[in-house]
From Swiss-Prot:
GO terms for cellular component: plasma membrane. Disulfide bonds: none annotated. Belongs to the UPF0299 family. HAMAP family: UPF0299. The lineage of its organism: Bacteria, Pseudomonadati, Pseudomonadota, Gammaproteobacteria, Vibrionales. It is a multi-pass membrane protein. This is UPF0299 membrane protein VP1300. Keywords: Cell inner membrane, Cell membrane, Membrane, Transmembrane, Transmembrane helix.
């Protein structure tokens, strides 16, 4: 029982180390290259490609990822509080925000539909 808990803790720590390591690599790449893509996104891509190439196994990352997903709602609390503090600004800009969200979604939807149509026609 204690041995199992200790093993789970070690697996969780390894998982968190891999996730935070990918984040650190992403931030470092972003700082050295100066690209406008956030380091966290680059870190996610680093982790994704290392898992795709088989350098990192999914089971190694799963305990930490599950923990983050389980408590993800807590990460939205500061954002929600910030939005409520600036609600008047949010309300004043509601139309551009809604228009950009709907417009962006439509652009993505149409682009993916065209791409899928092209790829399916190419196979047949």
């Amino acid at each position: 029982m204690i041995k199992d808990r200790f093993l789970q803790l070690i697996q969780l720590l390894i998982s968190l180390f891999l996730i935070m390591g990918a984040l650190g690599i992403g931030i470092t790449i972003q700082k050295f290259t100066g690209v406008s893509v956030p380091g966290s996104v680059i870190g996610m891509l680093v982790l994704f490609f290392s898992m795709t190439l088989g350098l990192v196994k999914v089971d190694w990352v799963k305990p930490g990822a599950t923990l983050f997903i389980r408590y993800m709602i807590l990460l939205f609390v500061p954002i929600s509080v910030g939005l409520m503090q600036h609600f008047d600004m949010l309300l004043a800009n509601a139309l551009p925000i809604i228009a950009s969200a709907v417009g962006g979604s439509l652009i993505v939807l149409v682009s993916l539909a065209w791409l899928l149509d092209y790829l399916l026609k190419e196979k047949h």
